[in-house]
A protein has these predicted regions:
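A generic secondary-structure micro-motif detector
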Residues: 24, 72, 95-96
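Short beta-strand/turn micro-motifs composed of small residues
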Residues: 49-50, 97
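Glycine- (often His-adjacent) and acidic-residue-rich active-site loop
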Residues: 50-85
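Glycine-rich beta-to-alpha active-site loop
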Residues: 83-97
C-alpha cells in the first residue's frame, strides 16, 4: 500500500491502495509506520504522491459505513496518528498531487 523509493537525496512515498488511494485503517497504519522508519533513518526531503489517477480520495467512506462504530473507533486514532507523523516529519515535505 505504501511504496518508498529514493531519488537522489529525496524520498518519494507513494500511496498505492485501490483505485483512488482511499484512506482506511490499514493504509493509515502503514503510512504512520513508513514515516517513522524514514524519520529514524535520518531521511531528508520527502515527496508524498498517489499512484493512479488520484492522490487520495480521503477517508474510505464505504469502509466506515460497512464497519460502523467499531471501525470508526479504530479509524479516528489511526487517522490522528498518521496526521501527527506527517506534521512532525523533520524534513521538508511536499505533496505531488
Amino acid at each position: 500500500m505504501i511504496e518508498i523509493q529514493t531519488v537522489g537525496t529525496v524520498q518519494v512515498l507513494t500511496l498505492s491502495s485501490g483505485r483512488v488511494n482511499a484512506q482506511d485503517v490499514e493504509l493509515l497504519k502503514e503510512l504512520t509506520g513508513a514515516l517513522g522508519e524514514l524519520q529514524r533513518s535520518g531521511a531528508g526531503a520527502l515527496v508524498v504522491t498517489g499512484a493512479g489517477r488520484a492522490f487520495s480520495a480521503g477517508v474510505d467512506l464505504n469502509r466506515v459505513v460497512e464497519g460502523g462504530a467499531g471501525y470508526t473507533d479504530r479509524l479516528i486514532p489511526a487517522l490522528s496518528e498518521a496526521f501527527e507523523a506527517m506534521f512532525c516529519y523533520p524534513g521538508p515535505t511536499v505533496a505531488a498531487i
